[in-house]
């Protein structure tokens, strides 16, 4: 507390602070004041870079200036080359191999959830993710169909969410999601809380294909991603 008060009462900004905290829990209002000197592709963008701060302290600010012997994985090598050339990296063979894992029918699925500090419904826990909406695009033989569900009411959305998903989701085909950890964990919680759906949910889980894989492995990488495979960076 004393340290914080010293900053508040100081007529000048403190020295540059640890960048890892500048976006938590949300982006700092004076982030650009501290870090505006960094180039567009800077060392803190290095993918999975546990030594980013050390590199910065050694005077390495630009990503293109990072020595190759400081890199620790294949993604960093790709990222460094893209930073130097400004070109997009595409591994067509790896992407083709990934696409062969998709079934003839593709079910592209996305959930939206809400959570409450104080549980709203019986049998739920604080901050438990409760799905209330889904978007489903089904591709079959070149044709596309869109299905959706949005809960309308103040009651527990999960029973009707599950019923609608079971009705609209095809019985076979790949269930394609982006960053599968979210959807799979929500589905597992639903199977636990609604055991009558457990067998069906477990069948869906076995069909999930994670579209994030080609991007997290940098089989496709654009320098504007800044070392991230999040959908917010990939989608544009």
Regions found by a protein language model. Name each.
Residues 33, 111-114, 139-141, 180-182, ...:
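An acidic- and aromatic-residue-enriched active-site/binding cleft used to recognize and process polar
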Residues 10-42:
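Cysteine-cluster motifs in flexible loop/terminal segments that predominantly coordinate metals
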Residues 94-171, 192:
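Conserved RNase H-like, two-metal-ion catalytic cores of nucleic-acid enzymes
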Residues 1-12:
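Internal, well-ordered domain-core segments that constitute the primary functional module
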Residues 17-18, 23, 27-29, 108, ...:
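A structural signal for short, well-ordered beta-strand segments and their strand-loop junctions
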Residues 42, 46-105:
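N-terminal accessory regions of nucleic-acid-interacting proteins
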């Amino acid at each position: 507390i004393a340290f914080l008060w010293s900053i508040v009462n100081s007529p000048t900004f403190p020295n540059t602070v640890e960048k890892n905290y500048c976006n938590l829990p949300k982006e700092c209002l004076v982030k650009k004041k501290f870090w505006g000197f960094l180039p567009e592709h800077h060392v803190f963008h290095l993918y999975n870079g546990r030594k980013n701060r050390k590199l910065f302290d050694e005077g390495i600010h630009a990503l293109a200036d990072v020595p190759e012997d400081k890199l620790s994985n294949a993604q960093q090598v790709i990222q460094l080359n893209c930073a130097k050339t400004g070109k997009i990296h595409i591994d067509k063979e790896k992407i083709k191999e990934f696409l062969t894992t998709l079934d003839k029918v593709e079910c592209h699925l996305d959930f939206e959830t809400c959570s409450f500090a104080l549980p709203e419904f019986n049998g739920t826990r604080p901050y438990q993710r409760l799905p209330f909406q889904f978007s489903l695009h089904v591709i079959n033989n070149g044709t596309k169909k869109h299905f959706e569900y949005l809960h309308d009411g103040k009651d527990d959305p999960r029973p009707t969410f599950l019923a609608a998903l079971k009705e609209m989701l095809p019985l076979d085909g790949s269930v394609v999601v982006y960053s599968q950890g979210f959807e799979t964990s929500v589905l597992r919680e639903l199977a636990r809380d609604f055991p009558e759906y457990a067998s069906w949910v477990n069948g869906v889980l076995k069909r999930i294909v994670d579209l994030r894989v080609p991007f997290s492995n940098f089989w496709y990488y654009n320098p504007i991603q800044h070392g991230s495979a999040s959908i917010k960076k990939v989608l544009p």
